[in-house]
A protein has these predicted regions:
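Catalytic phosphate/metal-binding cores of nucleic-acid and nucleotide-processing enzymes, i.e., regions
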Residues: 1-173
Length: 173
């Protein structure tokens, strides 16, 4: 289980955000929506490879295509490489604000709804229970994350790692 939430057997692809060696992603870098993901492990085969890149809201857009009489959910990236199987996208991350550490997960594809959750913070700076229908789900979460913070707290927010999981749709969340 990944953070006790995502069964590993459902994971098709796992990506990690690229960052310079030894550095962390800042709030502004994440908020800009220009994160690039590198594939960590190919856990099982998909008919069409997903490119390891997320630009703006391209990856995470939900579309329904007809495959014969059956409707199939597809996810596509900026290059329109299709994944013709029903999948879910999950963002998983670790972050630190000053001395407070936490981690969270976010289901970026759920019939247009975003579900997010964070835990592990003791100082009350972050409380995340956001529900929305923005396909830029992770960027939206980060934007909402900043609401209870002042500028100094936002500048102190660092993401140790951000990972993206492409999972089969039977993930329990």
């Amino acid at each position: 289980m990944i953070y006790g939430r995502i069964p590993e057997e459902t994971v098709l692809y796992r990506f990690t955000a690229q960052m310079p060696e030894g550095s962390k992603l800042s709030y502004n870098e994440v908020r800009s929506g220009r994160m690039h993901f590198r594939k960590v492990a190919k856990i099982s085969h998909l008919h069409h490879a997903i490119a390891a890149k997320w630009v703006g809201g391209s990856l995470g857009t939900r579309t329904v295509m007809k495959k014969g009489k059956k409707k199939v959910d597809v996810v596509y990236n900026a290059g329109d490489k299709m994944v013709s199987e029903p999948v879910e996208l999950w963002f998983v991350w670790k972050f630190k604000i000053n001395n407070a550490k936490g981690h969270g997960r976010l289901k970026a594809l759920d019939s247009g709804n975003c579900q997010s959750m964070s835990k592990g913070l003791e100082d009350g700076l972050v409380r995340c229970g956001m529900m929305g229908n923005d396909t830029n789900a992770f960027v939206t979460w980060v934007a909402n994350l900043s609401l209870p913070m002042d500028k100094k707290q936002r500048e102190a927010l660092k993401f140790d790692e951000v990972e993206l999981f492409v999972c089969k749709t039977n993930v329990k969340g």
